[in-house]
Structure formats: C-alpha cells, structure tokens
C-alpha cells in the first residue's frame, strides 16, 4: 500500500497516533476544534492531522468505527472501502473478519484519489465526474434513540436539504435482524483480537493498559461455538443487507451519537457497527456544527462492492450541503 502511494509521488511524512493497539484506550491526540475533546479512535492522529492541515491525506483502519468516527469528530472526510477492496499487506491485523484499510481527506474527490493510489489502480475505477443527483435512502436504525437531539435534528435537516436539491429520499424498512449487528460484531471482534494478540503479549501483559487487558480477557472467554455462530449470523445479515441496499446509490445514516466527547474515551461507534460487520463501504462528510461548535457528520453507506457509486453520491451531497469551515487553530 505504501509502495503504491510512493509510486504515484506521495510523500510519506510519518506515523500518526492511534488508540492503544487500535482498541479502546485513547491516545494523547486531541481534537483540533477543541483541545479539551477527543479526536476519536482508533485512527485519531490521522483524522486530527488532516483537520489541522498538517497533511492533506492520511491512512487509517477500521474494525468497528475507527475511520468514520474520528473523521466525523474532526470535521473531515473519512472513507472505509468495501471489505477486501484494499490490500492489508503491512497492516497490523487484529480481526481477520473485520479489519479494513481506510483514508482521510478534506474532500470526497481527494479521498477517492487516495483510495485509488493505495489500490494501485486508475482513479477512474473509484471516481466519476457525473453529478446527477443520486438515488438516496435514509435510515433510522434501532440506535436512533442513542443519538442526542443535535444529531437527530442535523440528520433530518441534511435529509430535507438533499431531498430538496435532488430526488425524493426513500425511508425503507430495514432488513430483518439489522439490530443484531452490535452483538454479532462484538463477539467476532473480541474473539479474534484476543487470539491475534495472545502470542505477542504472553508473559508481557503489564505492557498494556488495564482497559486493553480487560478487552482481551473478554475475548479470550468467548467459546469457539459462540464465535462460529456469530460468523454464521454475520453471513446471514450480510446476505440480507446487500440486495436491500443495492437499489440505492447510498443510504444516509448518522455517523456518531453526538459531538466529540472528552478525551478519556474515543466515543461511541454504534452508528458504524452494522456497516463494518457487513463489509459495506462507508463514508462520512462534514454536515454542520453542533451546539458546542464541534463538527457533526453525515454517514453514507452502500452495498458491498458499490464503492464507486457511493463516492459519487457522497460528492454530490458534499457540494449540496454547506461547508463547515476549518477548526479555529
């Protein structure tokens, strides 16, 4: 991946901070919009670096919400392609089933260019200049009640504005079982992370935080039968989601439950979980500021493999919604 970037002239500046082992324990990076707030996680340094103007592009990875959430908190574009669309060579993989490379930029076009470069492919495989209004759907999942008032109002305002500028936006009933995703992903993620780290940490457990030790202990306690059943459930849910999503260029959902929280946490990933579980492509674009003058984002997702359609839809939405400006650095 890095070789592909260098091959097209990218200048690699350095490594950014992540949450500890790309898990729950936050790193020291703060949010450029408010230094008393987190920049999310796990790819917190990448999102903050792009938001602060340190670099125009950055790489991240996502198991659950580690690209979409920090991008939303920092007011930049974050893109997680379909599972398997980008190579994981050289990546520290903790979940074979879920981990995916993603990227951050200040525009949808730039993040599409980044994805093409990482893939070693012509940008035309990812990007289209067609700005025909996309066919959109909007979805309130079972997690809707966890979103604060500002997120709910912002989401409805975004949907209304996009509908006024393009075609009517559908509100389809979600496919059955969608709200099981949280439980299924957690089982797979914890099981695989615990076993991925077992050899490296054996006898050196004190090198990691209590938060991570607890996380890995929970995963180690999951029985093989429960893990295999979770994999089967994932397959069933993904098979139901793909034909449901395919008629639409993108499905609109919230990205986070609220503005960036304080730095002892990386924030709640629940609005990312379903799409990560299904291997669906997801992108977040800045859509407004909340009551604390911190960014809120609009997430768009699509059927697995529909990355190019998703990026085109996101580009149309990006120019239709008002810009949020830059952080007050």
Feature locations, PLM:
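A short helix-breaking turn/cap at a secondary-structure junction
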Residues: 77-153, 157-158, 321-329
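Short glycine/serine-rich loop segments
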Residues: 1-115, 278-297
């Amino acid at each position: 991946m890095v070789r592909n970037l260098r091959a097209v002239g990218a200048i690699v500046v350095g490594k950014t901070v992540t949450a500890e082992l790309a898990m729950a324990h936050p790193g020291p990076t703060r949010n450029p919009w408010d230094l008393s707030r987190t920049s999310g996680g796990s790819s917190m340094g990448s999102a903050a670096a792009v938001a602060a103007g340190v670099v125009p592009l950055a790489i991240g990875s996502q198991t659950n919400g580690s690209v979409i959430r920090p991008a939303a908190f920092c007011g930049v574009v974050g893109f997680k392609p379909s599972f398997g669309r980008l190579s994981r060579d050289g990546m520290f993989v903790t979940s074979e089933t879920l981990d995916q490379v993603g990227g951050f930029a200040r525009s949808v076009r730039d993040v599409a260019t980044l994805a093409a470069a990482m893939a070693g492919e012509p940008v035309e495989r990812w990007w289209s200049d067609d700005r025909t209004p996309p066919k959109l759907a909007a979805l309130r999942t079972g997690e809707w009640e966890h979103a604060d008032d500002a997120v709910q109002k912002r989401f409805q305002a975004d949907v209304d504005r996009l509908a006024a500028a393009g075609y009517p936006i559908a509100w389809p009933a979600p496919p059955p079982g969608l709200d099981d995703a949280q439980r299924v992903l957690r089982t797979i993620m914890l099981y695989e992370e615990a076993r991925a780290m077992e050899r490296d940490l054996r006898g050196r457990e004190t090198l990691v935080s209590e938060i991570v030790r607890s996380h890995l202990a929970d995963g180690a306690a999951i029985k093989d039968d429960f893990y295999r059943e979770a994999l089967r459930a994932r397959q069933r849910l993904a098979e139901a989601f793909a034909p449901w999503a395919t008629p639409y260029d993108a499905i609109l959902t919230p990205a986070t439950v609220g503005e960036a929280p304080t730095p002892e946490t990386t924030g709640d990933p629940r609005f990312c979980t379903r799409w990560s579980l299904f291997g669906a492509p997801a992108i977040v674009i800045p859509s407004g500021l909340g009551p604390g003058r911190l960014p809120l984002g609009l997430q768009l997702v699509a059927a697995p493999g529909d990355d190019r359609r998703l990026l085109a839809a996101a580009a149309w939405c990006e120019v239709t919604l008002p810009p949020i400006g830059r952080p007050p650095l």
